[in-house]
Amino acid sequence: MILHAQAKHGKPGLPWLVFLHGFSGDCHEWQEVGEAFADYSRLYVDLPGHGGSAAISVDGFDDVTDLLRKTLVSYNILDFWLVGYSLGGRVAMMAACQGLAGLCGVIVEGGHPGLQNAEQRAERQRSDRQWVQRFLTEPLTAVFADWYQQPVFASLNDDQRRELVALRSNNNGATLAAMLEATSLAVQPDLRANLSARTFAFYYLCGERDSKFRALAAELAADCHVIPRAGHNAHRENPAGVIASLAQILRF
């Protein structure tokens, strides 16, 4: 079994760019940014429980990494960058730390490296279980209306929130709930030490208005790019800014 994805082919000899979306997104999420890099072959992946991979369920990050590895092999992708936002960034960091043949580097936008103590994990587990129950039992429009009121999305205006609620409500609540439970921050290990000892290139993007993830970025041994005029979802709020940062990274 492999993950559903959309492949776009570029010039031979350059590494692939493999894009991983955030929670409740899909393979279209990164395309406005990714299509600015037409010289590179691009793979836009649907993570388990999402988009064309909605019917695929996993028990945890190990399963996601295994599916990602098999998907890369199926597309004969031998050299690649992982580019991930939020959940996709966490998947990228986990997979990279577990080892992926052909990995050139990881570019993470607003991805959490992991909670650092049992108290934080227990608190997150309680919170995520409440969201899981809501995704299972309530209309998605109601759930996402509250989801986008969370502090991390404070930079969104009302129109942006309405647009995201409408877009994300096209998902399947049950498969979102399963993926949220399987990849909760409560079950993700703290990756800071692994990332410090990494053998791959590591870059971190965060919006200038995303104070939480700017603080997290400062804890990581990563080259950090702050995206102007953007909050947590920088590639949506300022795609040109993210394109500029990716172009700078890929020139090295």
Swiss-Prot record:
An example Gene Ontology CC term for this record: cytosol
UniProt catalytic activity: 5-enolpyruvoyl-6-hydroxy-2-succinyl-cyclohex-3-ene-1-carboxylate = (1R,6R)-6-hydroxy-2-succinyl-cyclohexa-2,4-diene-1-carboxylate + pyruvate
InterPro entries, sorted: AB_hydrolase_1, AB_hydrolase_fold, SHCHC_synthase_MenH
Record EC number: 4.2.99.20
Alphabetized UniProt keyword annotations: Lyase, Menaquinone biosynthesis
GO MF term list: 2-succinyl-6-hydroxy-2,4-cyclohexadiene-1-carboxylate synthase activity
Domain of life of the source: Bacteria
Family classification: Belongs to the AB hydrolase superfamily. MenH family.
Function: Catalyzes a proton abstraction reaction that results in 2,5-elimination of pyruvate from 2-succinyl-5-enolpyruvyl-6-hydroxy-3-cyclohexene-1-carboxylate (SEPHCHC) and the formation of 2-succinyl-6-hydroxy-2,4-cyclohexadiene-1-carboxylate (SHCHC). Is also able to catalyze the hydrolysis of the thioester bond in palmitoyl-CoA in vitro.
Subunit structure: Monomer.
Name by which UniProt lists this protein: 2-succinyl-6-hydroxy-2,4-cyclohexadiene-1-carboxylate synthase
Source species of the chain: Escherichia coli (strain K12)
